[in-house]
């Protein structure tokens, strides 16, 4: 497990916050709410309690699931329960054995919500399926269908 902590947001989070602020100034709405609405309209997103869950149509890597929330994750038992169900679903029903998960906590001073991102690292027995140069420097290589992944996640959340 890797854990990174800091007093200031890391570069990608700071960039996302800046983009989100400019988006609100230009369009008068939340970038993250609008992205979620597009995913929901495509059948890839669901609101569950105070969180929005969706399977990305532009995943960084296989089976990318994004959870946006505006609560204190350490005290939100519903969010914790949903995260548990999603992880169990990915492991038990989607065959995910190696994954990365990042969590940016909600900070009311920032434009962005709390964000949890989960990606499948691929078959642990295959060196070619893990993250590599193509994903980092070129384009993402995606072989999974987000509709199949999200239908399983939705079923787990509804259980």
Model-identified regions with their sequence ranges:
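HIT superfamily nucleotide-processing domains
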Residues: 1-159
């Amino acid at each position: 497990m890797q854990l990174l902590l800091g007093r200031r947001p890391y570069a990608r989070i700071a960039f996302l916050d800046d983009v989100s602020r400019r988006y609100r100034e230009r369009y008068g709405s939340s970038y993250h709410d609008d992205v979620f609405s597009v995913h929901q309209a495509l059948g890839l997103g669901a609101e569950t309690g105070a969180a929005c869950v969706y399977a990305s149509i532009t995943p960084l890597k296989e089976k990318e699931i994004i959870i946006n929330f505006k609560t204190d994750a350490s005290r939100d038992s519903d969010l914790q329960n949903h995260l548990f169900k999603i992880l169990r679903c990915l492991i038990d029903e989607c065959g995910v054995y190696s994954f990365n998960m990042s969590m940016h906590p909600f900070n009311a001073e920032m434009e962005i919500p709390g964000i949890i991102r989960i990606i499948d690292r691929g078959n642990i027995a295959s060196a070619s399926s893990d993250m590599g140069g193509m994903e980092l420097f070129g384009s993402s290589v995606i072989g999974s269908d987000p509709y199949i992944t999200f239908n399983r996640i939705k079923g787990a959340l509804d259980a």
